[in-house]
């Protein structure tokens, strides 16, 4: 599904989201409407502020970025770093933990408030407390902005609030965490 959304050609059938046929949309249309947060997010050598603002086409204030970071449970960590939002991220975020990298990418998504949010193991490096806080923000995003969220995950807790779900392979006992 993520490959189809990334504009690779389907061999048969169509994919529609919100009534739009993905094959009819341009890359620019997709970039505006869809945000993908992968398991290993793209971070570049620049400040945390600029990493969170990546892909935004408007002027963004520090307060907007901080609010997005709060929603992603990363603001407190950033405020402890030298330079705070001016802290320089190493190429690929190698001077940050895996969880910090994921939360920065999630802050980027919260700042953009997309129509469609695709989470591909986007919380796999987070502790349970952070994941629960971020799940609340996903719910808020759905309610306030009408965002459609497609979540690809192995952890059952990541999928518990979804309206519908599907599995690759036979379904097992959900109470054990095995699907």
Give names to the regions the model predicted.
Residues 1-2, 49:
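Post-Walker A alpha-helix
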Residues 5-7:
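Helix-to-loop junction immediately C-terminal to a conserved catalytic motif
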Residues 10-20, 30:
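Conserved ABC transporter NBD signature motif
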Residues 16, 21, 77-80, 88, ...:
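Conserved beta-strand positions that form and line the central face of beta-propeller blades
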Residues 32-40, 48-51, 68-72, 86-179:
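ABC-family ATPase nucleotide-binding domain "signature/switch" substructure
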Residues 53-62, 70:
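ABC-type ATPase nucleotide-binding domains, specifically the catalytic core motifs of the NBD
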Residues 63-80, 84:
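Conserved ABC ATPase "signature" region
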